[in-house]
Amino acid sequence: LNELIDFNVSSDRSGNSQPVRGLLAIESGGRSGSIAWDGSGLPPHLIALDPAKRSAVTLASAIAEVIARSRHEGIPIDCVAVNVGPGSFTGIRIGVTTAKTLAYALSCRLIAVDALAVAAGILFDRQPAVATACVALNAYRQQLFVATWQRNDWQNAFQDNSHAAADEVWPAERWHNLAAITTDASVCFAAEPSVTRFRDDTDCAMPNCQSIAGTVQTLEITAEDVAQFAWRLVQHAHFVPALDCNPNYLRDSAAEEKLR
């Protein structure tokens, strides 16, 4: 692995103005993590992590595979992109820590990617006629991480890297009921699969929650989606110093709330 890393190390850790040729993306905020390698002009290579194993175990081997692939293709890893949240506390923490360490070790640049903004982008790509996207990720404890975006505002936010400003925490019931009563065809709701099951989940029973069957699209963020989003931030040079990249948990953990 050290030999593979040596191939990727550049001469300037402090600030590199060279074009990004190869990007490694990390997605660990959901139930199924993944790693993606996206070299200039080549089809992205996605590695799905085994959900039955701990991310800390599977990330290392997947990253080693990507580094080997970049060496074989002769394209160094110039940038690491990572989903910084919101999402699973443990998954986000592992992903961000891995990305920071890797970016520092490879002397490459780092892009911090907002999970809800990626989700909105997936929906906008999937539905070209949709003007407004309201996306949700599972925050557990009958809560959701939510962001609502107008298409033009979402696109303009790349200029100042302000996507995270739209992130909110909602009661799950509020989002479900809004999705159930919205009839405007230009507004689309989408969420990860576990969110659409909330109403019937005995662990998250919400008797006052209206059915959203057939009204909400499901989506799952992959590292390839993270990479696609990151390339747009690369165009605006929104790089983060490796040691300054932090998770966006958006709220306290259950343990932290008990201490308050």
PLM ranges: what are they?
Residues E3-D6, N16-R21, A48, R54, ...:
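Surface "functional belts" at beta-alpha junctions
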Residues A56-A60, A99, A223-A227:
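A general structural signal for well-ordered alpha-helical segments in protein cores
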Residues N2-P86, E220:
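N-terminal beta-alpha supersecondary unit
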Residues S70-I77, A103-V113, P128-A131:
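Phosphate-handling active-site elements
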Residues A81-L110, A115:
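DPxDG-like acidic metal-binding loop motif
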